[in-house]
């Protein structure tokens, strides 16, 4: 996928607050304008902190540091290590889970994923499938919350009980320790009529 425009939040400055960025293809970026003389056929792009010098230098420094340390590749390798370890644990305990990695974002699905049908381009029609199966949605939500709480009780912080992020700071030893903690949770998982309990 090659986006027409990409918008970044504070990650563009290594987590520094009040930072963001917009980038994209020239044909679209040239239609952006700032200041009073935006002219016809241009979209005004600006904000309170636009071109803030401190945010700009934070962003520049973050990008240079990412290049110097090869941070994205390192984080991706640690994501692969975590994902491979999770898959091995899932197999070991015969759990109906799915783990996959997208760069440095590891997904751990402990219950069926929700899906929308956007073919009609109507939110109402798209959401109808979910509404027809709302009992399953509640079971899914409950299972995810329980698994997320079990992870947290074992020192694992996830996003919504299903996503984990690796970074340059993660080492093989840190990933292995995380996998030991996941194993503590996985060996206690039980399937019930109300979903999975840990």
Task: State each model region's role.
Residues 1-198:
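Conserved N-terminal phosphate-binding loop of PLP-dependent enzymes in the Aspartate aminotransferase
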């Amino acid at each position: 996928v090659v986006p027409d425009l990409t918008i970044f939040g504070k990650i563009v400055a290594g987590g520094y607050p009040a930072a963001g960025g917009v980038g994209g293809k020239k044909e679209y970026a040239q239609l952006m304008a700032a200041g009073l003389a935006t002219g016809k056929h241009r979209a005004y792009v600006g904000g309170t902190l636009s071109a803030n010098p401190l945010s700009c230098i934070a962003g520049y420094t973050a990008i240079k540091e990412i290049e110097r340390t090869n941070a994205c590749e390192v984080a991706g390798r640690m994501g692969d290590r975590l994902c491979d370890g999770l898959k091995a644990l899932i197999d070991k305990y015969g759990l109906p889970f799915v783990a996959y990695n997208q760069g440095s974002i590891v997904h751990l699905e402990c219950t069926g994923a929700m899906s929308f049908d956007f073919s009609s381009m109507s939110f109402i029609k798209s959401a109808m499938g979910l509404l027809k199966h709302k009992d399953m949605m509640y079971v899914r939500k409950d299972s995810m919350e329980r698994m997320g709480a079990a992870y947290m009780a074992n020192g694992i912080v996830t996003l919504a009980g299903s996503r984990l992020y690796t970074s340059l700071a993660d080492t093989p030893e840190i990933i292995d320790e995380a996998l030991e903690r996941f194993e503590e949770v996985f060996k206690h998982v039980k399937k019930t009529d109300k979903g999975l309990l840990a």
